[in-house]
Amino acid sequence: MRIDEVVRGEIVIMRPKGRLTLETEGEFREAVRRLFDIGRTRLVLDLANVPYVDSCGLGAMIQEFISARRRGGGLKLLNVCGHIRHLLAVTKLLTVFETFESEDAAARSFFERGPRGKARSSSPGGAFFS
């Protein structure tokens, strides 16, 4: 798996290419941890070039979502479609991960304010993994 990264201010757009599976989830986790090590905790995972995610890949996404939240950041998903959207729907994780159709919307979401001026949660179901 190849993972390109684009830095947009405080946000890193991660663009993996290939399947996120048992064989590749270690590479994904390593890339995320490397970003955490340099203080980058606001991540957008662009799934446009990820044709397939298995249970191990999904587990890695969940674990890194939790890790990002604990570090004061977040992991948001971009270009989720087909098999991956179905997988997230069946597992009810569409209520946990915020998903976006545009990079700009995903990036802006880290800075939007919710009711009472509080920063919006990284996900509608964010308390589940707090």
Question: What residues fall within each predicted segment?
Answer:
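Acidic phosphotransfer microenvironment of two-component signaling modules
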Residues: 82, 104-105
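Short, charged low-complexity linear motifs
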Residues: 15, 82-83, 124
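Intrinsically disordered or compositionally simple regulatory linkers and C-terminal tails
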Residues: 108-130
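Conserved catalytic submotifs in the C-terminal HATPase_c
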Residues: 8-10, 48, 104
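Short acidic-hydrophobic, aromatic-tinged amphipathic segments that line or gate anion-handling sites
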Residues: 98-102
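Residues at or immediately preceding the N-termini of alpha-helices
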Residues: 25, 103-104
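Short beta-strand/loop segment at the start of cytosolic alpha/beta domains
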Residues: 1-15, 129
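Amphipathic alpha-helical interaction surfaces in cytosolic regulatory modules
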Residues: 19-97
